[in-house]
């Protein structure tokens, strides 16, 4: 049986640029996972992975919700929303994964997608310098995120339910990813 998650792996900006945009439908709430677990087997779901993810740091912008920027495994990762399907699925395109220290030009692109202007006076920035920059900007916020994810598929469509802690507060998530 093919691993439907394998085709979505990217470890560099070049790899991310080659990925096909995918449509995502995601909900957050409380007490949604039990219902999913009760009904997923009726759909002949195939469980692939249960994973405890390393801590991630998300960057939120008051100026836009079109950019998804996070730091995971030492990489500054960005994808942008490029559309919405008629059914309401958001379409995201990976834009790159950048190793720290991040070059000024790469960081400028990320800040542009977050719709903020910050004077970049150095040629590169460490993770700590990046976080300090975000904290100092009133339009940006850092959110610490921890996830326990359960990946499965239904008819080769990637799905996942997860327990997500955002700055320590627990919320449940359910999502579906579909390549375009």
Positions of predicted regions on the chain:
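Beta-strand residues in well-ordered beta-sheet regions across diverse protein folds
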Residues: 79-81, 162, 177
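A short, sequence-level motif marking secondary-structure junctions
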Residues: 98, 164-169
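A short pocket-lining beta-strand/turn micro-motif at the edge of beta-sheets
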Residues: 148, 157, 170-172
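Generic structural signal for short, solvent-exposed loop/turn connectors between secondary structure elements
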Residues: 46, 155-157, 178-180
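Short, solvent-exposed beta-strand edge segments and adjacent coil->beta transition regions
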Residues: 20-22, 169-173
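Extended serine/threonine-enriched, polar tracts that run as long, contiguous segments within proteins
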Residues: 153-166
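N-terminal strand-loop-strand beta-hairpin
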Residues: 2-153
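Mixed-charge, glycine-accented linear interaction segment located at domain edges/termini
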Residues: 166-168, 175-180
